[in-house]
Amino acid sequence: MSSFLDQYKRQPKLFIDLPSKGASYDESVIQDQQYTQLPVFGMNTMDEIMIKTPDALFSGEATAEIIKSCVPMVKDPWKIMGFDLDYILLAIRMATYGDKMPVSSNCPMCDTQNDNEVMLTKMLEKIDSAQLETSVKIKELTFKLQPLTYKRTTDISQKHFTLQKQLATIEVADDKETDKQPHREKLLRAMGD
């Protein structure tokens, strides 16, 4: 029996096929391991509020929750690979606001503001046509490659941000240059880890 409210339920706006075709994903990432025809819903009010919360954005939690809300077939957004993530986020943007995204820029020479529109379907096509390379051979060495997950990318970004803030603190300190150098070297080594 259907309710008269069924017509007001949130409906998928588009369906997407992941560019990776599910390569490197286990059953915990996408429901039923369905990598094609994933329904994409537009953001709701709660999603809009979450995307404007700085702490949730910095931690990556806002993006993960919005993906779960708008692409419910994704069970664990933290395990999504980078180019699939870009594809999903573009699809959510399209489902919410439409195919055109306004972009503004100022000319560095004359300071004139230029307003344009980006067609998001073109961007999706570009991502979709990319080939996923899983190995690279250089002379006699073969390197096995795996794209970064959203979790790994977020962790790296947070670590890098923290180290940059610490480095900036060292630079503005009134200490002598010779006192700053060991602290700088320690932080730069930490950045490389």
Regions found by a protein language model. Give the residues of each.
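Long C-terminal interaction/binding lobes of large macromolecular proteins
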Residues: M1-D193
